[in-house]
Curated annotation (Swiss-Prot):
Subcellular location as annotated: Secreted
Protein name: Probable biofilm-surface layer protein B
Gene: bslB
Cellular compartments per GO CC: extracellular region
Quaternary organization: Monomer in vitro.
Protein function: Has a minor role in biofilm architecture. May contribute to the surface hydrophobicity.
Record-stated family: Belongs to the BslA/BslB family.
Signal peptide coordinates: 1-30
Record's keyword terms, sorted: Secreted, Signal
């Protein structure tokens, strides 16, 4: 475990040094993280729809766990996927209201995490906040983002 931690630390430090050499200081500023959420089949309460959530850390450099947080009424399962790979039970926390992807790397804002929640019964009409963040890690930039998903009445 110590060897792996040492390797990850070395990789992080090497990336930071390389980045500081290659980029002029004016280009090294991170943008704010962004997140978007939309329903695919319907926006009406109590109907079934896929939900697509796209989170971009937009970091100059980040190394940590990407975390999606959902409000009451939304629950992730092992039928859902991130970037085309189905979620594992160990990635689904808090009764499906949190999805955590361990050890992710974003360099120069290149990473994008597309979470697809399959065939979800939409909750009652209202406005719901969905959040994305990089937690338990190191990095340069602001990683927190949230978006609103509006569910319409029937």
């Amino acid at each position: 475990m110590l060897k792996r931690t040492s390797f990850v630390s070395s990789l992080f430090i090497s990336s930071a040094v390389l980045l500081s050499i290659l980029l002029p200081s004016g280009q090294a500023h991170a943008q704010s993280a962004s997140i978007e959420a939309k329903t695919v089949n319907s926006t009406k309460e109590w109907t079934i729809s896929d939900i697509e959530v796209t989170y971009k850390p937009n970091a100059v450099l980040s190394l940590g766990a990407v975390e999606f947080q959902f409000p009451d009424g939304f629950h992730a399962t092992t039928r859902d996927s991130v970037n085309g790979r189905t979620l594992k039970e160990t990635q689904i926390l808090n009764d499906g209201k949190t999805v955590r992807l361990p050890l992710t790397l974003d360099l120069l804002g290149a990473s994008e995490f597309d979470l697809v929640m399959v065939r979800k019964t939409l909750p009652r009409a209202g406005t719901y906040t969905i959040k994305g963040d990089v937690v338990n890690g190191l990095g340069i930039g602001s990683f927190y983002a949230e978006t609103q998903l509006v569910i319409d009445p029937r």
